[in-house]
Amino acid sequence: FLTAKIHLPTQNGQIDFAFMEQFIAELEAERIVELEAYLQATGLQDYTLTKEEEKALQGFEGVEFEEFRIEDVLDWQPQKEIDPLKLDNLKDVNQKLYPFYGQATINNGIISYNQLVDEVLNNKEGKSTILIHSNNQNTVYLETPFYLKDGHGATSVLQSEKLNKLNALYFMSSIKKVILSKYSYNAKATKIELKNTLISLPSSQGVPLYAYMEVFIKAVQKLVIKEVVEYADRKIAASREVVTKT
């Protein structure tokens, strides 16, 4: 390691530290501008809590919780799996580009994007969907049609008529809290196991409070994004100050 050589910018035979600092500063400024544009486009710049969201956070300790079997609140969907070695045989350039999911924990489980024949496409209506991979307990949310890597049925595809992005995030949090401590590679979260797994959800008279879950997640998102927005604002202000001085 001590004899390894690395390439660095130089000037007059000396490492050009000033150039490196300026280069990194410019890259950071570009990313901050992109972040600001993204926050504006998605409406995430507004991190002010509504009264309903404040109430959801303040009243969390007083909310009643009940344990539900996953099978009682989410529906298992039939799935079409693909052998990765046969992707070329399934290509159809007339189809739209959709994500191809595996069981990896990186990139949200997406291996690639492909145009394949309609017969192997899952979730054609683009419904809110939760994937749970039994080998590593990885949990993924999606709301697009998708392709699924052959895992011998190791992936559970879950939906519900009441499921949307916000309450799905709450469901996933509750599910992961249980399965990450209960299952492992040697004790897999199989479909039979998952169906009978109990998760804790806010409820009233035995019915999950879907609306409360949505408001609660929205409030938590705003609390998190507030720090991101304030960080971006500070960086943008600092960049403008440097530009003004120069």
Residue spans for each PLM region:
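DNA target-recognition domains and sequence-specific DNA-contacting regions of bacterial/archaeal
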Residues: F1-T3, E71-L198
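Non-catalytic DNA-recognition/assembly elements of restriction-modification systems
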Residues: Q11-G109, Q205-T246
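Residues within well-ordered beta-strands of beta-sheet-rich folds
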Residues: K5-H7, E26, L198-S200
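Compact, glycine/acidic-enriched structural inserts
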Residues: I6-Q11, S184-Y185, S204
